[in-house]
Amino acid sequence: MSLAGGDRPIRVLVADDSELFRELLARVVAAEPGFEVAAVAADGDAAAAMARALRPDVVTMDLHMPDADGYSGIARIMAETPTPILVLTANPTEAAGFRALSLGALDILEKPSATADLGEYGRLIRSRLRLLAGVKVIRHLRGLRERRDAAPARAARVEVVVIGASLGGPRALAAVLRGLPPDFPAPIAVVQHIADGFTAGLAGWLAQESRLDVREARHGDPLRAGRVLIAPSGRHLVLGEGVARLSDAPPVDTFRPSVTPLFTSAARQYGRRCCGVLLTGMGRDGAEGLRVIKDAGGPTLAQDEATSAVFGMARAAVELGAVDRVLPVDEIPRALRELTR
């Protein structure tokens, strides 16, 4: 049973301008004990008002609604009653959908097609809602400052940066990449846990948000200074000498792409010339890989708890002794600029 606390079910607010879809989603959500649809809303303003009045555990939000769209609804909810928000979109390749994540929504999922198996889709969306209902939402990325460990003595200039992120990652990635100059002297490779089909849209949005060359990785892509390669859905991203490689190897820690293969391949190829970064996310993916980078002599960074949507992956790495410095997300770009000089 999926409970938000004690014996209370997870209460979901559904926001969508289509009455038909609202009814369908309400049935799908409530099909399993432990979930309850607290209310439905037809636009962003109504969703914000209901969130303030009803205090649901999680909100599902359509983006394109008349009068007040999903973007304004998300902005109001995050300002007035911060609540975990799952964005539902009909177009996973649309970069504009990721604007919702920059406003504070935590996750994004494609709406079911007309031919979708609603039983399977129901299991998927309920698993996301269950996950999000347990997240303590922050109003802004900038938060209380956590103590930072002193930077280790640097023996070599960093020539490649690898980054791993999960829940809340798109917003954190945007904050990091926005802080880097267009002539950043190292390539960057990223694994972001996200629903299948969304990585191309994520790359497009990050390209708009930053001054870097951000693209979805292809097998054999050269690693170039100022280029950011995002692992595509369903394939591991690993680094060869000067090139990106995609792999269909089995999932690692249930993930494909997984952060750990990226980090371990970077450590193997670049050793102390590689910097590993773990951002916000749930679970342990990437923690062991970050320790491999540290053991190879490369510097390692982690996003702090105050600015993380979920301090899980980074916490696991800290507990392993794999992290040199724990930083607020808006201080990570400066650290990367210093390490690549």
Curated annotation (Swiss-Prot):
Report what the Swiss-Prot or TrEMBL entry states about this protein's PTMs. Phosphorylated by CheA. Phosphorylation of the N-terminal regulatory domain activates the methylesterase activity.
Gene from which the chain derives: cheB2
What's a BP term from Gene Ontology annotated to this protein? chemotaxis
Q: Name one Pfam family in it.
A: CheB_methylest
Q: What is its main location?
A: cytoplasm
Q: Which family does it belong to?
A: Belongs to the CheB family.
Q: Which residues form the Response regulatory domain?
A: 11-126
Give residues where 4-aspartylphosphate occurs: D62
Catalysed reaction per UniProt? [protein]-L-glutamate 5-O-methyl ester + H2O = L-glutamyl-[protein] + methanol + H(+); L-glutaminyl-[protein] + H2O = L-glutamyl-[protein] + NH4(+)
Q: Transmembrane stretches, by residue range?
A: none
**Alphabetized Gene3D superfamilies for the sequence:** 3.40.50.2300, Methylesterase CheB, C-terminal domain (3.40.50.180)
HAMAP family xrefs: CheB_chemtxs
Kindly identify the residues recorded as the active site: S166, H193, D285
Q: Which UniProt keywords apply?
A: Chemotaxis, Cytoplasm, Hydrolase, Phosphoprotein
Q: EC number(s) for this protein?
A: 3.1.1.61, 3.5.1.44
Protein's name in the database: Protein-glutamate methylesterase/protein-glutamine glutaminase 2
The Swiss-Prot or TrEMBL note on domains reads: Contains a C-terminal catalytic domain, and an N-terminal region which modulates catalytic activity.
**Which one of the record's GO molecular function terms can you name?**
phosphorelay response regulator activity
Subcellular localization(s) per the UniProt record: Cytoplasm
According to its UniProt entry, what is the function of this protein? Involved in chemotaxis. Part of a chemotaxis signal transduction system that modulates chemotaxis in response to various stimuli. Catalyzes the demethylation of specific methylglutamate residues introduced into the chemoreceptors (methyl-accepting chemotaxis proteins or MCP) by CheR. Also mediates the irreversible deamidation of specific glutamine residues to glutamic acid.
Domain CheB-type methylesterase residue range list: 152-341
